[in-house]
A protein has these predicted regions:
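NAD(P)+-binding Rossmann beta1-loop-alpha1 motif at the extreme N-terminus of oxidoreductases
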Residues: 16-71, 76-83, 109, 130
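Short, Lys/Arg-enriched N-terminal segments with co-localized hydrophobic residues
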Residues: 5-17
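Internal alpha-helical scaffold of NAD(P)-dependent oxidoreductase catalytic cores
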Residues: 113, 147-154, 172-266
Length: 364
């Protein structure tokens, strides 16, 4: 068995090529999906966005993403954005690997050039709020854009508790693919599922996309308690009561938000809570939450983490804005969302951390 970078060369789980999969966006999650995709015997291409130029140059030189500690499986091709057309030639599946900051760019520059018979799977997590207090999924936004062009695509998404570096490490991972057509989802699952990447499939797009987006503010909330305890007791003493107390309240509020979205099923809640857990303990949102809990305001925390993408803050702000509109309408009650509203005050009004513990109690 040959060695590369100190690691065994992969023996593919399927001996014959199955499909051509092109990943557009060389961010960490999109790039991590190249591992199960290639290990299943597919031809895999990664096309960087205009912001990924240095990443692609590094991949071409070293066959490794600069944020990963492991080489890509052999046989992956890398392209700069100018070669997008070449990267899409003969493609069977496209994976959208942009962050929520790239939603408009992806809709304007990538979706229009994908052949209509090619399904798309996106890793982009988030929701967009409207002036009347609705929360829309990114696939819904992209569909509206495509409709205005007279084009149709099969738009699917992946959600669930999965960090990119742990996927690269082949930690056992449970995710859900969602889309409008179950047969298409079965096809995508066949291309991507491995003995460590386990895929559920569902046509409840609103449910999965909402569950994995709604967790953002709550992951920040749990991380606040970590920072507060580090400030009060030092970094060496672990405290879990406060984390667990806020986590439990987060579960309640996420369930109410899923009800608001018409998607309060046990499966959707499980995907969202799992994603909340991994984000608290392995995500970038944890870092900003700890800094806020230690006493920094939001601007100071952002400055401390300069260069770290914090899309979770934007998504949390959008969700809170929609909820406040519905509270004003009388559709929702403020007392049902003490964590979300406090997080919104911290992000938007630079309010100091003052977790409303008494608001979490109940009498039955």
């Amino acid at each position: 068995m040959s060695l590369r970078g100190g690691l065994p060369k992969f023996i593919f789980q399927r001996s014959m090529k199955m499909a051509v999969i092109t990943i557009v966006g060389a961010g960490m999650m999109g790039s991590a999906l190249a591992f199960p995709a290639r290990e299943n015997g597919n031809e895999v291409r990664i096309v960087g966005t205009h912001l990924d130029r240095e990443i692609i140059e590094g991949c071409l030189a070293n066959n490794r993403h600069p944020k990963f500690d492991r080489d890509f499986p052999e046989g992956i091709s890398f392209y700069q954005i100018e070669d997008l057309e070449k990267g899409l030639d003969g493609v069977d599946m496209v994976i959208g690997g942009v962050s929520s900051f790239g939603v408009d760019w992806f809709g304007d520059n990538v979706l229009p050039v994908i052949p209509e018979n090619v399904p798309v799977l996106t890793v982009t997590k988030g929701l967009m709020d409207t002036e009347d207090g609705k929360l829309l999924t990114y696939p819904d936004l992209w569909k509206k854009k495509l409709d205005s062009m007279g084009k149709k695509l099969s738009l699917n998404a992946v959600g669930g508790p999965c960090t990119s570096y742990e996927l690269v490490a082949h930690d056992q991972t449970q995710v859900a693919f969602c889309g409008d057509d179950l047969e298409t989802l079965k096809y995508l699952k066949k291309l991507m599922e491995t003995d460590y990447y386990h895929v559920s499939i569902t046509t409840d797009v609103v449910g999965i996309e909402s569950a994995v987006a709604l967790k953002n503010g709550y992951a920040l909330g749990v991380a606040l308690t970590i920072g507060v305890n580090q400030k009060n007791f030092g970094d060496d003493t672990l405290h879990f009561n406060s984390q667990a107390g806020l986590f439990g309240q987060a579960l309640k509020e996420m369930y109410r938000l899923l009800e608001f979205q018409g998607a309060a099923t046990l499966d959707n809640l499980g995907v969202g809570i799992g994603d909340l857990y991994v984000t608290v303990y392995g995500g970038r949102t944890r870092l900003v939450g700890i800094l806020l809990g230690k006493g920094l305001n939001i601007d100071e925390a952002k400055a401390e983490l300069q260069g770290v993408t914090l899309e979770s803050l934007v998504v949390a702000e959008r969700v809170a804005r929609a909820i406040r509109i519905n509270i004003e309408k009388g559709t929702l009650k403020a007392e049902d969302f003490p964590v979300l509203l406090h997080i919104d005050d911290i992000i938007c009004k630079k309010a100091p951390v003052d977790i409303p513990w008494d608001a979490f109690t109940f009498v039955k």
